[in-house]
Swiss-Prot record:
The keyword Ribosomal protein applies. This protein is one of the early assembly proteins of the 50S ribosomal subunit, although it is not seen to bind rRNA by itself. It is important during the early stages of 50S assembly. InterPro entries: Ribosomal_uL13 (IPR005822), Ribosomal_uL13_bac-type (IPR005823), Ribosomal_uL13_sf (IPR036899). Keywords: Ribonucleoprotein, Ribosomal protein. Part of the 50S ribosomal subunit. This is Large ribosomal subunit protein uL13. The lineage of its organism: Bacteria, Bacillati, Bacillota, Bacillota incertae sedis, Caldicellulosiruptorales. NCBIfam families: rplM_bact (TIGR01066). GO terms for cellular component: cytosolic large ribosomal subunit. It comes from the Bacteria. Coiled coil: none annotated. GO terms for biological process: negative regulation of translation; translation. GO terms for molecular function: mRNA binding; structural constituent of ribosome. Belongs to the universal ribosomal protein uL13 family. It comes from Caldicellulosiruptor bescii (strain ATCC BAA-1888 / DSM 6725 / KCTC 15123 / Z-1320) (Anaerocellum thermophilum).
Length: 142
């Protein structure tokens, strides 16, 4: 028997809505990364985009446990000497809560050509409203 390899047009894509209210950021990002990759499907193939679309609502209500709001944060480098920048999660969640979720999910996806394709299937919104009602997304409890 041959090994099954999924083709991108054979795998049906579904849309899911996840409410981030009161959910820890890391656990939420891990579940989203699994759905975006398609690892929850029996047709999963590592080199093919078999994942589904994910809509995250109420991004501003995501929580971080312990002292991570002030202690941890988002680091990036400007490529100039002494250009290491640090933004604490407290400031990031106040100004751009969507970006905090996107950064966490991006770090949990594989570092290859498919990562940008997976990230295009992630839609994060502040508040309970989203413009994707026409896709008839299913509510997913985490």
């Amino acid at each position: 028997m041959k090994t099954y390899l999924a083709k991108p047009n054979e795998v049906p894509k579904k849309w899911y809505v996840i409410d981030a209210t009161g959910k820890p950021l890391g656990r939420l990002a891990a579940k989203i990364a699994v759905i975006l990759r398609g690892k929850h499907k029996p047709q999963f193939t590592p080199n093919v985009d078999t994942g589904d679309y994910v809509i995250v609502i109420n991004a501003e209500k995501v929580v971080l446990t312990g002292k991570k709001l002030d202690k941890d944060g988002y680091r990036y480098h400007t490529k100039y000497p002494g250009g290491l920048k640090f933004i604490p999660y407290r400031r990031l969640l106040e100004k751009h809560p969507e970006k905090a979720i996107e950064i966490a999910v991006r770090g949990m996806l594989p570092k290859n050509r498919l990562r940008d394709r997976f990230m295009r299937k992630l839609k994060v919104y502040r508040g309970p409203n989203h413009p994707h009602a026409a896709q008839k997304p299913e509510v997913l409890e985490i």
